[in-house]
Structure formats: C-alpha cells, structure tokens
Amino acid sequence: MAVSASVAAGDEDWVLPSEVEVLESIYLDELQVVKGNGRSSPWEIYITLHPATAEDQDSQYVCFTLVLQVPTQYPHEVPQISIRNPRGLSDEQIHKISQALSHVAEAGLGTAMLYELIEKGKEILTDNNIPHGQCVICLYGFQEKEAFTKTPCYHYFRCHCLARYIQHMEHELQAQGREREQERQHAAPEQAVGVQCPVCREPLVYDLASLKAAPEPQQPMELYQPDAESLRQQEERKRLYQRQQERGGIIDLEAERNRYFISLQQPPAPLEPESAIDVSRGSHQPSTLATKPSTTSATHTALSVSLPLASQYTCEKTPGAGPHLPKLGETQKAVLDPRRASRGPWRQPERRHLKGGECNTLKGTSDTQKLQSPEGPLKESMDLKPESHNQGGKGPPQDKGPGEWQGPPPRRTRDCAHWERAKNRTPASSYPRLPRGRGAYRPGPRREPVSLESEDGS
C-alpha cells in the first residue's frame, strides 16, 4: 500500500501530461504526441516548424520537423532533440539550430521547457527565411532581389529557369503521348503525367505565364576554358581509349549487330572440286606403294572414302601349291571392285571355290581400315578368275620379284560363266549349311562380308 501510494504521488508530481495538453491546445493539429506507458517509457513529440509570415505560405521558404524525445525523469533530465526533413537549410545551419536548442534545454533544466524549444525553432527559421544553396537547374546561388519560387515540396528555383524547364518537359510529354497513341491505339488510355519536380519528382503546381514574366537572372555567362591539367587528362584518356580499341576492349555496337548478318545479295563463291581418284583404272602407282608407305596409306584412305561401304572388303592371298600347304609370305590386301548400280538390289553372293588360294574377309575389322604396306617383297595381286581345266594344273603360281610388278589386275565383273561347279555336286543339289557365324547372310544395318573357301576346305 505504501509503494502504490508513492507511485501515485509521483504521477501527480509529473508535469509532462499537463504540459502536453497545453501544447495540443496551442498548436492543434500541428502537434503529434506518441505517449509511452506511463513513466516506464519515454514520450515522443513531433511538430513541423515554419517561419512566422502571418500565415503566408508562399513566403515560407524554409522548414524542418522538430522531434523531442522526453525521458521519464523529465523535467530533471534534458529531452533528446533531433531535426528531420529540413528544407532550404544547409548542413551548417542545421547544426547551428541543433546547438541553439540544446543550450535552451540545458538552461531550463528542472522546469517545463517544451514550449520554449518549439518557439526557439520558429524564431530561428524566421530569421533565416532565405533558401540556402543553388538553383538545381542553373547551379547558381540565389542573390538578393532575384525572382525565385518555391514548390510545394520546398524546393527552390529561379522563375526564369523553372519556366524553361516546364516548357521543355511539356514538349517531351506531348511527343511521348503521340508515340503511345500510335503504339497502343486499342489499349486502355493511361493517366497523363504532368510536369514533375526535377529534385523529388513530385507533381508541380505552377503558373507558366507568371514564371515567364519574371526577369532573367543577371548571372555572367562564363565560357568553359580547360586548364593545363584538364588537357593532360584528356590526352591520357585518348591514349587509353586507342590502346583499348587496338586490343579489342571497345565494343562497337554497330559491328556487333552485323556480326552474324548474312547477305543474300552476293552469291557464295563456287567451291573448288577436289581431285577425284579413278578407282576403276587403278591410278595409284606401285612404285609409290613400295617406296612410300605414308603416301600409300593416304591413297587408300581416299579410295575408301570414294567407294561404297559395302564394297570395301579385303582379299587375302596365300601362295602355294594347294589349299593344304602352309601359308607363305605376308598377307597382301587389295580393295575389291564395287557392285555396279545396274545390277539392281544387292543379293548375297554365292560361295565360289578358287584354285591356288582363298579369299576371306578379315573379321573384326571396320569397313574403312587403313591399308598396310607390305614389309617384304610385294606379291602378285590375286586374280579372282580361276584357271580353265583345259590348260591343266601347272602347280602353284610363281611369285614374281619386286621388279616384275605388273600393276593391279584388270577390273572384272562377276560373270557366272567363268565359274565352275564342284565336281561332286549336281544342279539340283544344295550346299551344306554352314555353322552359325560363318558366311551366313544376316540382314541388318551393316552388311557382313561373305567368306570364300576352297573346295576341299568346305
């Protein structure tokens, strides 16, 4: 009970609530109070101050908002003073006003001082009711007896400068309006935007005729003349620009736009035809094949490209008296002739029996494998046409020396009249079925070569 009685007695001795009521009755709506929770939190008082001009708002060129944060120990403790939203005042003037109000608060410590602080701020604004700074349009300071105007957002301009700015902005807005009408003929009309303040972009309320009637400012027109330091900096920047341009550091917008531009007016230059190799006549020289393996490989690559994939098979010859003799020498590879287009769709070739050698395809090799030059003496190229029985068997074919190279064999067509049927087979008989994977035709995207075996080896 004693504690509550002391608290009640302290609230009665606190003068802040009664002083705030007096201030609200004097300044009415100009004063805003944020009350705390009794004496446990400070109160805040906001008021916007203007010069005393007998309610002539057009003559009020400066203003600011005074914020007083009253502590719980007021009036025995000085309130915290801050100035917000100053208009027409320089930083130096704002600092001087803050110091003057602090001196007033310290002088009235222990008594009610809020009213004195507010009136001191108004007095300072009345004494400094001249906008400080420069016209943001012409960047010249304000002089006495000059015609200048104040916007509702408390920004200041010379009347002549503001009139020229308004005329320019009106022409710009009209041009933008015509462009919008052409682009959006069927779109909903947008709300027109008037001339805005060049500082804060607030809408301006103006009388263009009265602004144009104001006298022009008597400021001297100073011509710009660069000094030696400015000229030196210009030369340095010029050299830097040229250096960046030489190294590709400057982006040319026009060149970038036409970077991927393709002109259809000029026809493209005709391409030079590549040297075609006559495969049918065997134009590659045997001497080059024997002496320069690298050239032979390049020629074989060109032949492999020009031939169809299905016809790029290799033929392996084993010289000897018969198929039962061991293989002699190195394997010689040659490219078989392609199928002619006049024979229609391709069919699986029948197995033919050769005398004196066998023709097999290398398993596991690609169609475009590289031709390997023989290490030993070159062998005679294989002739797929078997010898006639009328001539009689004269033993195995004789190998020719390196100097007896006769060139590649003449190209032959697959004429069935030159092939003989096996002696132990009749026209009605069929060949025995081979095991899976040995010469059987398998339809697929890649055509497997057919292996040819001798008569005794079948």
Curated annotation (Swiss-Prot):
Q: From which residue to which do the RING-type zinc fingers run?
A: 135-201
Ordered alphabetically, the record's keywords are: Cytoplasm, Metal-binding, Transferase, Ubl conjugation, Ubl conjugation pathway, Zinc, Zinc-finger
Annotated Gene Ontology cellular component terms: cytosol; nucleus
Q: Which residue intervals define the domain RWD in the entry?
A: 18-128
Which regions are flagged for Basic and acidic residues bias?
A: 377-388, 412-423
Name a GO molecular-function annotation: NF-kappaB binding
GO biological process annotations for this chain's record?
positive regulation of NF-kappaB transcription factor activity; protein ubiquitination; rescue of stalled ribosome; ubiquitin-dependent protein catabolic process
Where does this protein reside within or beyond the cell?
Cytoplasm
Ranges of Polar residues composition bias in the record: 282-299, 362-372
Locate the region Disordered: 267-299, 317-458
The Swiss-Prot or TrEMBL record describes its family as follows: Belongs to the RNF25 family.
Its subunit composition reads: Interacts with UBE2D2, and may also interact with UBE2E1 and UBE2E3. Interacts with RELA/p65.
- Designated name of the protein: E3 ubiquitin-protein ligase RNF25
Q: Which organism is it from?
A: Bos taurus (Bovine)
| Name of encoding gene | RNF25
